[in-house]
C-alpha cells in the first residue's frame, strides 16, 4: 500500500457519496430475490460504542454487500432500543432528563456508526421511544389483553431494591439483578403479566425448524423447562388440609418417608396462626423468618447444607400405602416452584438423601436399577428370548491396600468385577465367596454385606443366550493373599487383577457395573429408572411404564409443567412505554385504539420512588382522566406502571419493513415480501430474554393475522465478545475501553473492519490488541 494513502480523506469522500446518492435506500419490491439481514439494535448508552460493539455490525455489513453484489434486494436497517433501565439509569447518574440523554446518545451512536461505513438504509431508522413507534407496541398489548393473554397479578415478584422496580425471571441471574447485581427480593405487588406459558409448547417445538446455534436452542429448551409429572394429594392427619405435591417420579411414591414445604407455603402460614397447632411453634417461627430473609441463590445453593425444621405434631398420609410421614419446612423448597411442597424419597433423590442423612430419617429403596446393553458382542440379540438368572457381583477389597479385585474379559471388551450365578439354595454371601475362589483363587474372602440389587439385560456370548440377570451386589474383604488353583477355562475367559480404589470407576466400562461401584462408594441412593420393589401391586414392574398407573391409582392428576413463568411485564419506573389502560375502581378499561399512542408525559422527578409506584403516579393531571358528560361523568385513573425495556425490541424487526405506516403495524404485502429475517446477528446473552420474547410476540401476531410466518428469525449467528487487552470485559470501571473513533482516525475504518473479522472464531470471546492492527493496515 502506498505510504501516502489517506484513509480519512478517501473514506469520508465515499461515505458522503453514498449518502448523497442514497445508494443503500431499499425498495419494497422488484424482480430481485429479497434478503433481510439484521443486527440486534443497540440501546444507546452514554458511553457510546467501544470497539467490541461493531463486531456484529461489520459481519452483517459484509453479508449485506455480498448479497447486493449477488443480485439480491437487501434490507439492512438500523435503529435504537432506547427505552428501559440502561438509558434511564444513565440519565439519573448524569442528572439529565432521559429524553435529552437519549437524544444525545442516539446522535453520538449514529455518528460513530456512520464513520465505520456501514450500508444501512437510515431512512428506515426506528427508535422505541418515538410515540409513532410505541403506538404499535401499545396496540400489541391491547390485542394481548383482548385475547386473554395479559392479566393483572398480585403474586410476589422479583424486586430489585437498588433499581427499585420489579423484574421478570429472565432479568434475574443467580438470584441477582442482571443490571446491577443487587440480590433480588420477593415482594407482593400489582403487576401486568403476559401469558407466555400458553405458547410454551410451540416455542419448544418450533426450535427444531430454526437454523440457530445449538447452544442457543438448548438454552431456550432448558429455560422453558417442560416436564410431565403427577400432582398427588397427601391428606394431613386430623385436619382437613391436603398437601399437593408435583413430582416427575410418581413411580417412587411407595418410597416417600417425609414431605417438605416451603417457608412461604400457605399451609405453614395457617399453622403458625395458632401456637397450639405445633409442638415447636417458636422454633418454626424463627426458622421461617430467617428463611424469608435469604436470597433465592442462598436458599438453592447446591453446596449449602440442607436445613429444615419438623412441623411437630403434623403427619401426612401417603395415599399409596396409608403410611404416616412427618412434614418438614425447609428453605431449599421454593413457593413458586411446582406447588411449593415436595414428597421426599431419599433412596432415589440426591437432595432428599442428604437431608434424610442429616436428620436421621428413614431411607426406603423402592426401585432397583435396570440396564439394557445394546450393540457390541454383549448387546441384546433381537428375536432371542431372555433367560432369567439370579446372580452375584463381588466387590472385593485387598487385605492391606485400598485396592479392589477386577475382571477383564478376553472374549469382548467388558471390564468389571468377579460375577457369577447363585446356585440352588445358596444365599448371596455363599455364592460370592465361592465365585471369588473359583475365578481368582483367593480363599479368604469374607462376605460383609449386600449393597443393593442391579438388574441387567445383555447377551452372554459365552453361553450364547440373552441374559436377564438380577445381580446382588456383595461386598467382601480378604483376610490374606492365600490362593488356590484357578481352572484353565477361567484363565481363558478373563484376566483378574487389582485396581486402586480411586481408579475403579474409570476401569469398569459398563453402566450397570458403574452403578454397582456407586452403591459401594456413594451409598444406596439411586436416581434412575428401574424395577419396582416393595410397591404393592406394582412390585416387579418397570418404573417408566407404571408412572401414570400409580398416579391414577391414588386419584392424582397427570400434568405438564414448565420452568418458564408468565412474563412479568410491569416496571415501576418512568422511562418506558405507558400502558394503554385506565382503571375504573377494580374494572380495567382499555384505551380506544383511535386514542393511541398514550404519550409518556414530561415529569419533574423521574427518579424511582421505591414505593412500588412509578414517578408517573405523581402527575395528577395525566393520571386522572375525565370521561362521560353530565351525570355520567366520572374520573378514571391511568395505569402508572410502564412496560419493560424488552417490549419495543420484541417486534422492531417488523417495523423496519414499513417504518412510516400510520395505519398499521406493518403493511401485509410488505410483510409477506420481506418475510422472516434471513440472517440475524447478536449476542448469545439474549438467548433467554429478547429471543424468547420476540418469538412469543411473533407467534401471537401470526395467530391474529398480522404476520405470515410462525418464526421471526430464520438464521441466527451469535457474536463472541471482544474483551479488553487485560482480558476483562470492556468497561469504563476497568479503564480498558478502546474507542472506535480513535482507531478509525489512526488506522481507518477498513483496517478496523478487517482486524475484527480476522481476530479469531467469530462466535468466541477474544482479547483486543491494538498492536495487531498493523497487519490489517498493511
Predicted segments with their positions:
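N-terminal strand-loop-strand
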Residues: 370-418
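N-terminal catalytic cores of NTP/NDP-binding nucleotidyl/phosphoryl-transfer enzymes
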Residues: 27-98, 102, 125-140, 163, ...
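Residue patterns forming the tRNA-binding/recognition surfaces of aminoacyl-tRNA synthetases
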Residues: 4, 13, 17-21, 93-243, ...
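Unchanged
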Residues: 422-515, 519-535, 540
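Catalytic alpha/beta core of large soluble enzyme barrels
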Residues: 60, 73, 265-369
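Conserved active-site neighborhood of enzyme catalytic/cofactor-binding cores
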Residues: 44-75, 176-178, 279, 338, ...
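Conserved oxyanion/phosphate-binding beta-strand-loop segments in alpha/beta enzyme cores
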Residues: 1-38, 68-77, 101-108, 212, ...
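Amphipathic alpha-helical
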Residues: 10, 15, 196-227, 262, ...
Amino acid at each position: 500500500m502506498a505510504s501516502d494513502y489517506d484513509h480519512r480523506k478517501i473514506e469520508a469522500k465515499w461515505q458522503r457519496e453514498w449518502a448523497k446518492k442514497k445508494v443503500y435506500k431499499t425498495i419494497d419490491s422488484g424482480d430481485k430475490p429479497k434478503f433481510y439481514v439484521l443486527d440486534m439494535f443497540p440501546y444507546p448508552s452514554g458511553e457510546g460504542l467501544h470497539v467490541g460493539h461493531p463486531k456484529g455490525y461489520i459481519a452483517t455489513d459484509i453479508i449485506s454487500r455480498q448479497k447486493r453484489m449477488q443480485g439480491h434486494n437487501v434490507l439492512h436497517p438500523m435503529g435504537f432500543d432506547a427505552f428501559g433501565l440502561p438509558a434511564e439509569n444513565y440519565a439519573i447518574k448524569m442528572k439529565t432528563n432521559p429524553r435529552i440523554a437519549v437524544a444525545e446518545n442516539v446522535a453520538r451512536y449514529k455518528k460513530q456508526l456512520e464513520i465505520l461505513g456501514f450500508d444501512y438504509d437510515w431512512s428506515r431508522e426506528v427508535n422505541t421511544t418515538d410515540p409513532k413507534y410505541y403506538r404499535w407496541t401499545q396496540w400489541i398489548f391491547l390485542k394481548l389483553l383482548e385475547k386473554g393473554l395479559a392479566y393483572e397479578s398480585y403474586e410476589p415478584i422479583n424486586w430489585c431494591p437498588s433499581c427499585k422496580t420489579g423484574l421478570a425471571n429472565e432479568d434475574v441471574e443467580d438470584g441477582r439483578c442482571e443490571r446491577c447485581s443487587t440480590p433480588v427480593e420477593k415482594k407482593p405487588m400489582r403487576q401486568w403479566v403476559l401469558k407466555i406459558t400458553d405458547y410454551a409448547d410451540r416455542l419448544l417445538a418450533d426450535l427444531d425448524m430454526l437454523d440457530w446455534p445449538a447452544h442457543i436452542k438448548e438454552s431456550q429448551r432448558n429455560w422453558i423447562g417442560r416436564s410431565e409429572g403427577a400432582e398427588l394429594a397427601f391428606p394431613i392427619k386430623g385436619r382437613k388440609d391436603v398437601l399437593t405435591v408435583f413430582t416427575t417420579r410418581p413411580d417412587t411414591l411407595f418410597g416417600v418417608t417425609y414431605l417438605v414445604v416451603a417457608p412461604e407455603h400457605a399451609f405453614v402460614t395457617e399453622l403458625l396462626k395458632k401456637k397450639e397447632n405445633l409442638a415447636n411453634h417458636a422454633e418454626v417461627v424463627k426458622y421461617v423468618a430467617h428463611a424469608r430473609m435469604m436470597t433465592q441463590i442462598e436458599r438453592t445453593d447446591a453446596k449449602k447444607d440442607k436445613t429444615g425444621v419438623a412441623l411437630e405434631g403434623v403427619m401426612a398420609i401417603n395415599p399409596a400405602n396409608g403410611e404416616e410421614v412427618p412434614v418438614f419446612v425447609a428453605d431449599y423448597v421454593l413457593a413458586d416452584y411446582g406447588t411449593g411442597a415436595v414428597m421426599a424419597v431419599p433412596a432415589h433423590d440426591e437432595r432428599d438423601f442428604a437431608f434424610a442423612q442429616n436428620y436421621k430419617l428413614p431411607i426406603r429403596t423402592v426401585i432397583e436399577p435396570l440396564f439394557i446393553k445394546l450393540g457390541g458382542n454383549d448387546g441384546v440379540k433381537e428375536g432371542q428370548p431372555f433367560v432369567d438368572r439370579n446372580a452375584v457381583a463381588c466387590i472385593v477389597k485387598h487385605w492391606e491396600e485400598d485396592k479392589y479385585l477386577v475382571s477383564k474379559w478376553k472374549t469382548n471388551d467388558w471390564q468389571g468385577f468377579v460375577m457369577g450365578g447363585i446356585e440352588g439354595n445358596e444365599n448371596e454371601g455363599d455364592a460370592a465367596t465361592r465365585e471369588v475362589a473359583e475365578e481368582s483363587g483367593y480363599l479368604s474372602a469374607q462376605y460383609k454385606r449386600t449393597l443393593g440389587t442391579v438388574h441387567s439385560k445383555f447377551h452372554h456370548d459365552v453361553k450364547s443366550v440373552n441374559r436377564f440377570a438380577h445381580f446382588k451386589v456383595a461386598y467382601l474383604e480378604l483376610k490374606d493373599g492365600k490362593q488356590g488353583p484357578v481352572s484353565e477355562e477361567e484363565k481363558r475367559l478373563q484376566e483378574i487383577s487389582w485396581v486402586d480404589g480411586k481408579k475403579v470407576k474409570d476401569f469398569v466400562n459398563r453402566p450397570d457395573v458403574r452403578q454397582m461401584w456407586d452403591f459401594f462408594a456413594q451409598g444406596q441412593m439411586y436416581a434412575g429408572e428401574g424395577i419396582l420393589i416393595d410397591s404393592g401391586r406394582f412390585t416387579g414392574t418397570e418404573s417408566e411404564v407404571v408412572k401414570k398407573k400409580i398416579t391414577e391409582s391414588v386419584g392424582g392428576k397427570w400434568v405438564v409443567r414448565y420452568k418458564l413463568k408468565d412474563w412479568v411485564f410491569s416496571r415501576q419506573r418512568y422511562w418506558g412505554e405507558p400502558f394503554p389502560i385506565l382503571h375504573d375502581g377494580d374494572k380495567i378499561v382499555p384505551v380506544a385504539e383511535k386514542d393511541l399512542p398514550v404519550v409518556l408525559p414530561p415529569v419533574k422527578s423521574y427518579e424511582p420512588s421505591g414505593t412500588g409506584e412509578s414517578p408517573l403516579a405523581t402527575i395528577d393531571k395525566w393520571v386522572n382522566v375525565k370521561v362521560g358528560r353530565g351525570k355520567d361523568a366520572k374520573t378514571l385513573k391511568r395505569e402508572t406502571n410502564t412496560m419493560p425495556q424488552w417490549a419495543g425490541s420484541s417486534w422492531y424487526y417488523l417495523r423496519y419493513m414499513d417504518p412510516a405506516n400510520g395505519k398499521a403495524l406493518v403493511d401485509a404485502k410488505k410483510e409477506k415480501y420481506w418475510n422472516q429475517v434471513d440472517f440475524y446477528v447478536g449476542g448469545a446473552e439474549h438467548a433467554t430474554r429478547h429471543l424468547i420474547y420476540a418469538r412469543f410476540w411473533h407467534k401471537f401476531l401470526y395467530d391474529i393475522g398480522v404476520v405470515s410466518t410462525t418464526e421471526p428469525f430464520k438464521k441466527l449467528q451469535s457474536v463472541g465478545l471482544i474483551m479488553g487487552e487485560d482480558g476483562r470485559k470492556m468497561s469504563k470501571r476497568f479503564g480498558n475501553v478502546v474507542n472506535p473513533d480513535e482507531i478509525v482516525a489512526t488506522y481507518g475504518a477498513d483496517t478496523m473492519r478487517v482486524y475484527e473479522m480476522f481476530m479469531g472464531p467469530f462466535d468466541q470471546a477474544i482479547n483486543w490488541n491494538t498492536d495487531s492492527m498493523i497487519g490489517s493496515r498493511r
